[in-house]
């Protein structure tokens, strides 16, 4: 059903066409056909390829098999509560530390990438939760990293950081040990958000809904689905440019007032490198932060956490 795709020559697989055209989702949730049949930005390229990738994954491991593995997965940990607990304990935003090897904009960030070693260092450094990149082509991650980290005995709740466009990915995330998933509003309309949130909740996982614009945030807040956590990504996924003021400006609108009144846990994402940055998003109203590059590129990520917060957690 999703996402619509273009033809294979853009994916490096010859000229045979898929049956679909590329679409975009406006901040209001309306779909727009891409008549040029080619990705217009990095986000569309990622989502476009995801459709092909999922076709291969389903051929290799059918959904019925994945759902069977969900029943054998480790017990779900409460991702949201772990953040709240740290926030109340420290008086600072709960830390979601990201296990990340590379990105489309920066290339390889940590050449000596060892997901288990990094995850353990984050845990020792006091992270409330971990975010694990599972996209293979663009971020050099994988769903197996979730499993490796969980089997290594790491007790922090895990977020599956993936460009989710299909229910298959949600079940696979839980089967590999994830406790929460990310849903990106720029990729999904409200029908998708409601449907995928329902599936995640059915297997015990929490959902981090991500927005970047006023329109996306307004759409999510008006949706008829439960919001566990709401993240504001300071990175424009179309260009991968980062601006910390995105969080500040959105939280200064009436929407920021609404999330405070509804007691929604807000997560500041991307562009957080210093204690000053932490203070900026906290003062804007964020109870948690998701940090990757500034921590993972260091040889001692646990020390990086101390530097980021100005003290041990």
Question: Where are the model-predicted features located?
Answer:
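C-terminal helical cap(s) of enzyme catalytic domains, especially alpha/beta-barrels
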Residues: 7, 14-24, 246-253, 282, ...
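Active-site mouth loops of central-metabolism enzymes
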Residues: 32-33, 43, 96-116, 156-165, ...
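Glycine/Thr-rich beta-alpha phosphate-binding loop at enzyme active sites
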Residues: 99-113, 118-140, 219-257
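Glycine-enriched alpha-helix->loop->beta-strand junction motifs that scaffold or abut catalytic
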Residues: 126-127, 152-156, 175-181, 201-205, ...
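Glycine-rich phosphate-binding active-site loops on the catalytic face of alpha/beta enzymes
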Residues: 132, 172-192, 231-240, 284-305
């Amino acid at each position: 059903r999703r996402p619509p795709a273009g033809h294979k020559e853009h994916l490096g697989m010859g000229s045979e066409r898929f049956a679909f055209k590329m679409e975009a989702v406006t901040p209001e949730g309306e779909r727009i056909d891409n008549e040029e049949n080619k990705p217009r930005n990095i986000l569309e390229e990622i989502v476009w390829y995801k459709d092909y990738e999922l076709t291969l994954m389903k051929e290799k491991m059918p959904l019925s098999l994945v759902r069977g593995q969900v029943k054998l997965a480790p017990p779900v940990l409460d991702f949201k509560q772990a953040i709240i607990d740290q926030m109340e304990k420290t008086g600072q935003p709960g830390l979601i530390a990201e296990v990340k090897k590379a990105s489309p904009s920066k290339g390889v960030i940590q050449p000596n990438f060892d997901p288990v070693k990094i995850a353990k260092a984050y845990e020792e450094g006091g992270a409330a939760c971990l975010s694990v990149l599972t996209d293979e082509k663009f971020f050099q991650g994988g769903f197996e990293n979730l499993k490796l980290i969980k089997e290594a005995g790491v007790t922090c709740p895990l977020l599956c950081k993936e460009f989710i466009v299909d229910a298959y990915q949600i079940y696979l995330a839980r089967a590999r040990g994830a406790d929460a998933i990310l849903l990106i509003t720029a990729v999904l309309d409200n029908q998708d958000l409601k449907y995928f949130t329902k599936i995640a909740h059915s297997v015990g996982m929490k959902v981090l809904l991500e927005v970047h614009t006023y329109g996306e945030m307004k759409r999510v807040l008006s949706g008829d689905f439960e919001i566990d956590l709401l993240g504001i990504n300071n990175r424009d996924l179309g260009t991968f440019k980062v601006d910390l003021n995105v969080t500040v400006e959105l939280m200064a609108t009436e929407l920021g007032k609404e999330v405070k009144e509804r007691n929604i846990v807000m997560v500041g994402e991307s562009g957080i490198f210093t204690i000053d940055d932490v203070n900026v998003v906290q003062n804007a109203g964020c109870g948690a932060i998701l940090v990757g590059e500034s921590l993972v590129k260091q040889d001692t990520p646990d020390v990086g956490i101390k530097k980021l917060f100005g003290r041990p957690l």
